[in-house]
């Protein structure tokens, strides 16, 4: 499989239009049109000879720049196809050089040396975001446990109340002791006088 880079595209160009333009040269496996930023695309030809024919015939047509994009390391995946641009060296594509690797034929967002296509980075950021949401319930759970930790103080509040009851119960026995030995009111007065 051979990947072809197409630059200087009109932002309104669709994948179907590109496929119709290049279909006559051979079997196209996939077509990818950039949207952010627009203006370029990649086509995967099943046969590298078909890709070379397409580059020869279409390069310069409609103002397009058509170059071959080589996979680094001998064809390791779709993301790698966007990383190369060896064919662009001979064409002087200095205005389309990648800021990451210095090669022409692709942008920094599509450079393999940067860690793959931009889509992969977005997927990583999405994968990182769910753990943040997963952590929040744990914090919420800890907060929910804190009221349970505060629940023991109510028994402590109950403990003073029996003491208060003891104090309320204790005075009647003292009064009973004073009143029991002396049935008459005079006896109580005599005791108080004798104590005085």
From Swiss-Prot:
Residue ranges with Basic residues bias: 119-135
Stretches with biased composition (Basic and acidic residues): 58-70, 88-100
Bias type Low complexity, positions: 139-149
GO CC annotations, alphabetized: nucleolus; spliceosomal complex; vacuole
Cited CDD domains: RRM_SRSF3_like (cd12373)
Highest taxon of the lineage: Eukaryota
InterPro entries from the UniProt entry: Nucleotide-bd_a/b_plait_sf, RBD_domain_sf, RRM_dom, SRSF, Znf_CCHC, Znf_CCHC_sf
Positions carrying Phosphoserine: 48, 136, 144, 146, 151, 159, 170, 196
Compositionally biased intervals (Gly residues): 72-87
Keyword Metal-binding: yes
Subunit structure: Component of the spliceosome.
Protein family membership: Belongs to the splicing factor SR family. RSZ subfamily.
Function noted in UniProt: Probably involved in intron recognition and spliceosome assembly.
Name this polypeptide is given: Serine/arginine-rich splicing factor RSZ22A
